[in-house]
């Protein structure tokens, strides 16, 4: 079937009132950004839905794959726009039906927003269903659980027909909910946390703490790849890579071994707090999950949070690990996250870390050394990369150039 439009149904933004236009306009911009590399389409949005007009030869499959990742979209359907006659509806319904397998069932589902159309909803359903049965001998009707649902939308300008509904990502358009800084470790949890806040319309920049030579270049490349996957949902993402070696080594010199994990995370939070203000963000996001590891007890979180007044969002706080893994697999980050490259959270891990840290004790250990210059040094040394869905590292680019020269 050759379609001429893609119908985009809005998600939660349909609940908005006077400010709905802001959300629709942002979603339209995000859709254009997602489709930008492709050709042969025009995006038209109104208050209730969006239509993408397709030129001949447009890559509908690739467009749908991109659109279903855009937050704010409830579902999409490739559709055909036809003239407002019963004959045209019958003809197209029969074309749909002839592609179905022997023994399949179908249903005709009509929505009629144009009340001046000469057939009411039920009369049109009966007429079109009868036309399909008359023209085929391999199908039967099932109005409760059909294999195929042929949908007919009678609107003021035309009739739109389709038989596919592709689930979207839901949520709100990214860019309507402020900006956050995502602490991206390289593990399973933090990319999922990033997706969850982006689903609520929040723009994300990411921060990663890199401690060479204790963490390898492979660990850095892993985080870049995770950011690249996330950017497939929202467009380019800034990744701030923090040189954390000196700060982490000093923590391990002056802080009691059982408290080094708590203190290390406090230093990360101090760096992140400065970056939040530099990029004009409004919160810090991490992938912490209550009780999952020693640093994720309530007392640990309290001790770590104590160094910042910036809100810290934890979208995964109460989820089971199995649910987080499932989400990671769905968004495509799981296989990257489990690559066995250590990050700065796993090096120098004490054998018996404190799980219920006393905030007065950790402050006592830290007060013996002025960490502020090292914190500022880490901020000043940040490397910022703009990661897109087709991002290639300098190493990858050089390798590709060499291959092109050789072959």
Swiss-Prot record:
InterPro entries cross-referenced by the UniProt entry: Rossmann-like_a/b/a_fold, ThiI_AANH, ThiI_fer, ThiI_N, THUMP_dom, THUMP_ThiI, tRNA_STrfase, tRNA_sulfurtransferase_ThiI
Cellular component aspect of the GO annotation: cytosol
SUPFAM superfamilies xrefs: Adenine nucleotide alpha hydrolases-like, THUMP domain-like
GO biological process: thiamine biosynthetic process; thiamine diphosphate biosynthetic process; thiazole biosynthetic process; tRNA 4-thiouridine biosynthesis
Keyword Nucleotide-binding annotated: yes
Domain THUMP, chain residue ranges per copy: 61-165
The protein's Enzyme Commission number: 2.8.1.4
Keywords noted in UniProt: ATP-binding, Cytoplasm, Nucleotide-binding, RNA-binding, Thiamine biosynthesis, Transferase, tRNA-binding
Enzyme class: transferase
Tagged with keyword Glycoprotein: no
Catalytic reactions of this protein: [ThiI sulfur-carrier protein]-S-sulfanyl-L-cysteine + a uridine in tRNA + 2 reduced [2Fe-2S]-[ferredoxin] + ATP + H(+) = [ThiI sulfur-carrier protein]-L-cysteine + a 4-thiouridine in tRNA + 2 oxidized [2Fe-2S]-[ferredoxin] + AMP + diphosphate; [ThiS sulfur-carrier protein]-C-terminal Gly-Gly-AMP + S-sulfanyl-L-cysteinyl-[cysteine desulfurase] + AH2 = [ThiS sulfur-carrier protein]-C-terminal-Gly-aminoethanethioate + L-cysteinyl-[cysteine desulfurase] + A + AMP + 2 H(+)
Binding site for ATP: 183-184, 208-209, 265, 287, 296
Annotated compartments: Cytoplasm
One GO MF term: ATP binding
Superkingdom classification of source: Bacteria
Pathway the protein takes part in: Cofactor biosynthesis; thiamine diphosphate biosynthesis
SMART domains with a match to the protein in the record: THUMP
Function of the protein: Catalyzes the ATP-dependent transfer of a sulfur to tRNA to produce 4-thiouridine in position 8 of tRNAs, which functions as a near-UV photosensor. Also catalyzes the transfer of sulfur to the sulfur carrier protein ThiS, forming ThiS-thiocarboxylate. This is a step in the synthesis of thiazole, in the thiamine biosynthesis pathway. The sulfur is donated as persulfide by IscS.
Family: Belongs to the ThiI family.
NCBIfam families: tRNA uracil 4-sulfurtransferase ThiI
This protein's name: Probable tRNA sulfurtransferase
Annotated source species: Staphylococcus saprophyticus subsp. saprophyticus (strain ATCC 15305 / DSM 20229 / NCIMB 8711 / NCTC 7292 / S-41)
């Amino acid at each position: 079937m050759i379609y001429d439009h893609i119908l985009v149904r809005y998600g939660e933004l349909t609940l908005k009132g006077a400010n709905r236009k802001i959300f629709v306009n942002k979603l339209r911009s995000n859709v254009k950004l997602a489709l930008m590399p492709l050709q042969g389409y025009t995006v038209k949005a109104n208050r209730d839905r969006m239509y993408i007009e397709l030129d001949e030869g447009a890559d509908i499959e690739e467009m749908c794959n991109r659109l279903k990742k855009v937050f704010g979209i409830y579902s999409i359907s490739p559709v055909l726009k036809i003239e407002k006659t019963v004959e045209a509806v019958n003809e197209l319904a029969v074309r749909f039906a002839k592609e179905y397998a022997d023994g399949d069932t179908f249903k005709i589902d009509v929505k009629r927003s144009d009340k001046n159309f000469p057939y009411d909803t039920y009369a049109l359903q009966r007429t079109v269903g009868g036309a399909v049965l008359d023209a085929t001998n391999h199908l039967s009707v099932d109005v409760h659980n059909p294999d195929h649902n042929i949908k007919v939308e009678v609107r003021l300008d035309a009739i739109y027909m389709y038989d596919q509904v592709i689930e979207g990502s839901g949520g709100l358009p990214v860019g309507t909910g402020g900006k956050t800084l995502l602490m991206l470790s390289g593990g399973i949890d933090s990319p999922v946390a990033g997706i969850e806040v982006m689903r609520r319309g929040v723009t994300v920049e990411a921060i990663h703490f890199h401690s060479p030579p204790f963490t390898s270049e492979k660990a850095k490349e892993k985080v870049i790849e995770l950011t690249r996957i996330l950017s497939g949902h929202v467009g380019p993402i800034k990744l701030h890579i923090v040189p954390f070696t000196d700060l982490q080594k000093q923590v391990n010199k002056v802080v009691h071994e059982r408290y080094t994990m708590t203190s290390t995370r406090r230093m990360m939070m101090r760096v992140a707090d400065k970056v939040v203000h530099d990029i004009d963000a409004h919160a810090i996001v991490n992938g912490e999950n209550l009780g999952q590891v020693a640093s994720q007890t309530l007392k640990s979180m309290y001790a770590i949070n104590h160094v910042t007044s910036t809100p810290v969002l934890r979208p995964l706080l109460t989820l089971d690990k199995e649910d987080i893994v499932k989400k990671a697999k769905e968004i495509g980050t799981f296989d990257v996250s489990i690559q066995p490259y250590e990050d700065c959270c796993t090096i120098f891990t004490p054998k018996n870390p404190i799980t219920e840290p006393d905030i007065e004790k950790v402050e006592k250990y830290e007060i013996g050394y002025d960490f502020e210059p090292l914190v500022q040094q880490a901020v000043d040394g940040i490397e910022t990369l703009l990661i897109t869905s087709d991002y290639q590292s300098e190493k990858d680019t050089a390798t590709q150039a060499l291959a092109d020269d050789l072959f």
